[in-house]
């Protein structure tokens, strides 16, 4: 659990996720502000259904993505690469996620975009502050953690 704890701690301090979706051989990427749920190991985002990435995702889709800072030196690079699944939330699940999202980003109260969950199934965290090229791996289904 130390690996997931370190990853979760870092993700909780960031706020923008990039993810890519594929449909019929076409790729598209998008960015959004996110709320990270450490217990579910998931991001919550808002995005309109009319967007290209939402249209390509449909109600749920496999995705890959990144979260990274913008350091000016290589020694301070930290970032996450992940794969998982995006799905549009409905009903009570959506309402609960939206309340939490609005607490993190109060301006979102003005938006009517649906709430989506990005469930992370594999995470690779690079943290050069622990040594150049230091990587930590977390896999949801195997319970595997590698440092």
Curated annotation (Swiss-Prot):
In terms of InterPro entries, this protein maps to:
Split_barrel_FMN-bd, UPF0306
Disulphides: none
NCBIfam families referenced in this protein's UniProt entry, alphabetically: PRK03467.1
The family annotation for this protein states: Belongs to the UPF0306 family.
* HAMAP family linked to this entry: UPF0306
Q: What is the official name of this protein in its record?
A: UPF0306 protein YhbP
From which source organism is this entry?
Escherichia coli O1:K1 / APEC
Gene, per the UniProt record: yhbP
